[in-house]
Amino acid sequence: KICFIFLRILLKMLFGKKAIVEHNRYYFKLCAKHINMNKVRLCDYIFFPGGAQISAFVNFEKPIIYYTDATFHIMIDYYWHGLSSWLITQGEHYEKEAIKNAFINIRSSQWAAASVINDYDGCLQRNYVLEFGANFDDKDLLHATPYKSGALNILFSGVDWIRKGGEVAVKTVQLLNKRGINSCLFIVGLSEIPLKYANLPFVRIMGFLDKNNPEHYRKYVDIVKNSHLLLLPTNAECSAIVFSESSAFGLPIFTYDTGGTGNYVIDGVNGYKLPLAAREQEFADAIEKSLESNEFLQLHKGGITLFNERLNWSTWSKRFRKIMEENNL
């Protein structure tokens, strides 16, 4: 643990506060030293939910399945900005090693899976897409009531105010209210937002909710269940699990067309993806149009269907088993 702390401090000193510290040879070598090879020998294969780069330093002698939501390459200047050339070279090199060493590569979106092929020359025949499921207990999956009239409860969920588009979300709801659509924005994931927005009468700050905490989990389920739509104008996104969770309850989704969102939000089926140039005017227009055309019920049903077909962990496990069988594992 001391070595990891020292490495983090050193890299921050060398490359600045924004430096990512988990994508270089020194970090992966430290991780490799913590592998218990006696336990590895008891396994039939190795499943990496990220972090398969340590395979560059450990000969596992087992088939590796590498599953994650992105590649290093597509995160540069997307999530990560201002990286030094050394950090980029390190990250690219060990991502390529991880993909090459993996017998099977699986990503949570077509966007990420395409990068495995296009940016790292991964094996097309053993490259798959498996979407993330919703992190809800089956017993709690009681569909939300589609919006008909009264106050429109809008859910915003995220811990990064800027990246998730918090300002656009607030201004969208503000505009809806000005148009006579009584709307309330429930903000989950943040305890504080800019003061000029926190005191607006239609904003409800629900705080950060840890789904591993039973009380927080119950509160989160109740919020989602009592919402009518998800508004998430996120300008950078790999595979937000809240998309799957919203579809599980039948909440129409309004977001940006970016990253891996295309596997989770299908225009006209369970919501709409707007171009990145869109602002609150366009989001308000899209929501208002869906309300006026009575499309919410269709989007509600479409979300539930999409969840049942592929955005749940039960289907994920069946598809994963099929992938394993196809590859004789």
Per-segment meaning from a language model:
Residues 72, 84-105:
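Membrane-proximal helix-turn-helix segments that form the acceptor-binding/catalytic region
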Residues 194-229:
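Nucleotide-activated donor-binding/catalytic signature segment of Leloir-type glycosyltransferases, i.e.
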Residues 138-164, 169-175, 185-188:
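Conserved donor-binding/catalytic core segment of Leloir-type glycosyltransferases
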Residues 231, 243, 252-255, 265:
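Short hydrophobic beta-strand element within catalytic cores of glycosyltransferases
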Residues 235:
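Aromatic "clamp/platform" in nucleotide-sugar-dependent glycosyltransferases that forms part
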Residues 295-310:
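A short, well-ordered alpha-helix in the C-terminal region of glycosyltransferases
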